[in-house]
């Protein structure tokens, strides 16, 4: 007996940050046929890349069953990690970059891999701020979330004399 085919879902994601680091927000819009669900959140002190990853993670985690997911993002960082082999290379090198430095946002990359595991995900790049309706919608929501976090400024970064540990 053949298993039933997976449902095909569109996931539109965006992250925003007021300063980098600074207050940030993320948004994810899920669409299945005529049904939509908008998810969003924010953090007081984060980066734009962390918010891009968080949007994808939370969108995928909201799915109740394994799906075929078309993930639309305006983040080269997110898309190229999968489509250009960055993530595969980082993992082979023990979460190190080609230069031997620890991969930034490893915690979120690992969370994203877990969130993706039950699904078949295809990444699509959408150029930001070009009038793409869903991208504009998640961009507005991510910025709204970032602004709602702006009450708490990031603590100043203290200079350090030591190398980062893995």
Swiss-Prot record:
Xref: InterPro entries: RNase_H, RNaseH-like_sf, RNaseH_domain, RNaseH_sf, RNaseHI
HAMAP family, per database record: RNase_H
Chain residue ranges for the region called Disordered: 128-166
Keyword Transferase: no
Record's subcellular location: Cytoplasm
GO biological process assignments: DNA replication, removal of RNA primer
Subunit field text: Monomer.
Family designation: Belongs to the RNase H family.
Enzyme nomenclature, EC number: 3.1.26.4
Swiss-Prot/TrEMBL catalytic activity: Endonucleolytic cleavage to 5'-phosphomonoester
Residue ranges, compositional bias (Basic and acidic residues): 131-144
Described purpose of this protein according to its UniProt entry: Endonuclease that specifically degrades the RNA of RNA-DNA hybrids.
High-level lineage: Bacteria, Thermotogati, Deinococcota, Deinococci, Thermales
Chain's gene name: rnhA
Binding-site positions, Mg(2+) 2: 14, 139
CDD domains: RNase_HI_prokaryote_like
Protein name: Ribonuclease H
One Gene Ontology MF term: nucleic acid binding
Native source organism of the sequence: Thermus thermophilus (strain ATCC BAA-163 / DSM 7039 / HB27)
Record key words, sorted: Cytoplasm, Endonuclease, Hydrolase, Magnesium, Metal-binding, Nuclease
Cofactor(s) required, per the database record: Mg(2+)
ATP-binding among keywords: no
Gene3D superfamilies xref list: Ribonuclease H-like superfamily/Ribonuclease H
One annotated Gene Ontology cellular component of this protein: cytoplasm
Transmembrane segments: none
RNase H type-1 domain: residues covered: 5-147
Main location: cytoplasm
């Amino acid at each position: 007996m053949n298993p039933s085919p997976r449902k095909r879902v569109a996931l539109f994601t965006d992250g925003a940050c007021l300063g980098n680091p600074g207050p940030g927000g993320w948004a994810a819009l899920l669409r299945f046929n005529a049904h939509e669900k908008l998810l969003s959140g924010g953090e007081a002190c984060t980066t734009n890349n962390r918010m891009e990853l968080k949007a994808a993670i939370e969108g995928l985690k909201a799915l109740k069953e394994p799906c075929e997911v078309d993930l639309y993002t305006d983040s080269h960082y997110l898309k190229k990690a999968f489509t250009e082999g960055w993530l595969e290379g980082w993992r082979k090198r023990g979460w190190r970059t080609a230069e031997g430095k620890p991969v930034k946002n490893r915690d979120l990359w690992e969370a994203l891999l877990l969130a993706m595991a039950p699904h078949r995900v295809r990444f699509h790049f959408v150029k930001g701020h070009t009038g793409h309706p869903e991208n504009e919608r998640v961009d507005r929501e991510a910025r709204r979330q970032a602004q709602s976090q702006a009450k708490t400024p990031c603590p100043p970064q203290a200079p350090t004399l030591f190398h980062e540990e893995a």
